[in-house]
Amino acid sequence: MQRSLVGSEMCIRDSYKDVRLVGTPPASIGAFGGDYDNWGWPQHKGDFALYRVYADREGRPAAYSADNVPLKPRRVLQVATGGVHDGDFAMVIGFPGRTNRYASSFAVAEKQCVRNPIVVANRHDRMDILKRHMERDPRVRMEYSDAYFGLSNYADYAKWENKCLRRFDVVAIREAEEERLQRWIEADSARKAEDGTLLEELARGYKARQGAERNLNYFREAWLGPSEALLVANRVSSYLGKLERLKQDSLIVDSKDARSVVAGSGRLRRNYDAATDRDLLARMVVNFTANVPREMWGAQLQAMYDKAGGNADRMARAAFDASFCSDPARYDAYFSKNRSVAEIRRDPMVALTESVTVQRFTGGVDKAEKRGRARVGRSESRYADVLYDFRASEGLAQYPNANSTMRLTYGSVQPLNPSDGVHYDSRSTIAGYMEKYNPDEYEYRVDDRMRRLIAKRDWGRWGENDTLYVNFLTDNDITGGNSGSPVLDGKGHLIGLAFDGNRESMAGDVWFHPELARTVCVDIRYVMWVIDKYADAGWLLDEMKFAK
């Protein structure tokens, strides 16, 4: 905080870019339970990592240098050692990514009926392929584990979001609110003149774009990310477009502009397995051609599909095998000399990516779809403003949607009753961790050192009631982007780290359920025990401050 000349105050944010990894637990601690336990309870994850921020000798931000020193901030969070219990105050400070709690009933219905089913089906297909290859080869497991978790995380989210939207009948709740909203609009002549047809316009817009939205989601799932080779081809295609705009008909390999494209095989040298990528491409192309109208494919894809006798799987595999974009050695050899734009465009993977373009799917193929998409964009924005004012008029406390800016959510440690006859305690223990131990399941493996330490039951000052608490639940309101956010008690002391939500609250993007929403946190005492006892890194604790 710096004081200006006129006496007011202005916030100044410094960005420290020299941030170094100090340590992180193995997957058998940090990711214990894997995607099986994801969004579930009880969990037993030691999900944390330690970083140290470096600065110049005056404590100012600086680029990486061997001369930099650890930053010594004036204030740091103190670590609480007393543990948590039901009803204890808890607040989370972090950077939640996005919510859409002013979405119309039409938007919620579209998500529930169009987007989420497509996401779940396609990502489970990709997960099946990854799992098969990961089980075949430990190297592939290492290279694709992050990708697999990302797919699992979002697929599970979409699946449970739909279950929650149906369970709580969120569309019907929004429709009932919109009936009251319409009456409120019509009760005032100025409001009626400006927004009297707002809901009608939304209904028309969503109906007009229904098919386009379905096609767009299949496009996203098939062409934006599953195949690294296809991403390489897309990068090449983008550069060809640049050459055309410059009225150049050849790629000169030693030109400054072309160097990034010539070096593009680097993407195929990191976390890439050709056999895996080939299967991913084929599966997504099959899904795309089976569900998207032929007129949306583009001429090249249509021709390649027909040449393969209508066999999309065979077509995709043949394109992959013949392309320089799928093999780093082939790529480097191809761009070892100058190439004409026309010649490069004959590569089958480049032809695929140029045939199926994002503009075709975001713009729509007819005027009705284009008008529908434009109408929805304008009307949803206005709808959010009007709904905000309407809810405020009903005395409801309002707050803006999450947008990756810092937010604070407050609540308390709470158990969970997710359904009839089912009760979950608010805390999980090390006993549950060992109950799940299974040496034959990668996600539930426990290494020898961890098993020996647990058998000794030496919890030090981190234990309570002759056990070690691992995770706990709060009723805080978080979303994607909050992972790693500090969880504080009423004195501002660190009691844990938020890392997950629960399945029963997955409608939280559009509708928050206060009785069922839970934040899953790692108990800070478990973090300290792992550092102290498992890692035998007690010197790191000397750098921390502990609440008395």
Pin down the residues of each PLM region:
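Active-site substrate-binding loop(s) of clan PA
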Residues: 34, 70-85, 425
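Cationic-aromatic interfacial patches
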Residues: 109-341
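Charge-dense, extended regions
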Residues: 254-470
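Short, basic/aromatic beta-hairpin or loop at an interaction surface
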Residues: 55-70, 463-470
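Single conserved hydrophobic/aromatic residue that forms the stacking wall/gate
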Residues: 2-7, 11-12
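C-terminal subregion of chymotrypsin/trypsin-like serine protease catalytic domains
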Residues: 92-145, 491-548
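Catalytic nucleophile loop of clan PA
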Residues: 78-88, 477-498
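Short, structured beta-strand/loop micro-motifs enriched in basic residues and often containing a Trp
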Residues: 66-76, 408, 475-478
